[in-house]
Amino acid sequence: MNTYSEDFSDQAKCKQIALNQIDQGASVVFQVAGGCGLGALDAAKEKGVWGIGVDADQSFLGPHILTSATKGVDTAVFDTIKSIQDGTFKGGKDDVFGLAQHGVGLGKISPKVPKSEVDAVMKVRDDIIAGKVGQIPTIVK
């Protein structure tokens, strides 16, 4: 299920969207909605289902957080500034900062997740970094 809040600040709106999805059978809430998404994570806590944080590690929100999809904006900014300083910056092109470049990643994984499952996730992550996984989709359909 996916629903667009069309809002990045109204936590009550995102909470209601998440509650509706949970009522329809969702057992994990993965929000990508800025501050609005905090309401969705609150709904996950309230209903006793997993929540997945976004942008930074949101495990501090409680034991209902499975993990977080993190963005390494700091890495992208640092690398870009460094390339400007050392004269290697080439404007006019897109640079992709994936797992290998620390542009994306996972926050802390809940200690409630069995080690075998964490190991399986880490293996896939390592395989992606090593180029052993084919084309990764970049568009939600």
Annotated model-derived regions:
Residues 1-141:
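A residue-level marker of the well-folded mature domains of exported/periplasmic proteins
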